[in-house]
Amino acid sequence: YCFSGQMAQYLPAGVPAVMDFVDVDSAKFAQFADAGSAAMRWMMRREARLLGAFERQVSASVRASLFVSEAEAALFRSGGGAGRIVAVENGIDAAAFDPAGVDAATQGPLLVFTGQMDYRPNVEAVAWFAAEVLPRLRQTHPAVRFAIVGRAPTAAVQALAAPDVIVTGAVDDVRPWLAAASVCVAPLHLARGIQNKVLEAMAMARPVVASPAAAEGIDHAGTLRVAGSAAEQARAIGALLDDPDAASALGDAARARVLARYDWAARLAPLDALLGLGA
């Protein structure tokens, strides 16, 4: 079993292997190219082209290629991916991410974003949210605060810190922050596969407002709010802040959905079969 495309170069020749790509990384670089300068567009498109060729070469040499969602698997197939291509979705440890076992207290409305804070899509998401969504929310909810929770915040992320914007850096445990959230937000514009940050917030029974990109790939059945523009996100968050009962009901439904759909035992069954670990 080999995890992530970066490690594929170390696979011994002739050894049967299952390759877990997680996402189609070449497609991610193609997306980066769409938003960069002329020089960056050229570089990112070149990286996407070369990486795509490498991904296809690897997939032709292994027993199976795994992706984190059926959408990613279908994208890889459409791009010429060879061999057996299987979707093995992310799951969640719902026993660990259980609000019943976490104490948290907060004063006033708190919005929480979690993630690795030197990862470009996360950096861009929180910067956009702080600049575009928070000012709209403050017009109707002046006491609202925004917590950016995650390790290795870049200088750009640290510069967002203000009396009503908390930049935590690394934390020992993200669960108290999730438990304290009035609403968890995932305003990513670029996202691939399934966002663990969204599943974790749902498992903690928190109401979630996610961008279409962040919600894509999650079979949420309406148990989170999907909102695209800054105005739409501000309205969705504001409505949940104004109606705590509705917010609580949405969070409870989100946890129930995670328990039903994203339990690790069910999610890993295809991998067990591929590795010959089934009963």
Tell what function each PLM region has.
Residues 11-15, 59-68, 73-92:
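Helix-loop-beta element that forms the nucleotide-linked donor phosphate-binding surface
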Residues 14-56:
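Acceptor-binding helix/loop patch of EC 2.4 sugar-transfer enzymes
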Residues 60, 75-78, 87-180:
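Conserved catalytic-core segment of nucleotide-activated headgroup transferases in glycan assembly
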Residues 63, 165, 179-193, 204-207:
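Acidic donor-binding loop of glycosyltransferase active sites
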Residues 197-200, 207-211:
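Short hydrophobic beta-strand element within catalytic cores of glycosyltransferases
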Residues 223-231, 238-245:
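Conserved acidic donor-binding segment of nucleotide-sugar-dependent glycosyltransferases
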Residues 246-261, 270:
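A short, well-ordered alpha-helix in the C-terminal region of glycosyltransferases
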Residues 264-279:
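C-terminal alpha-helical cap of glycosyltransferases
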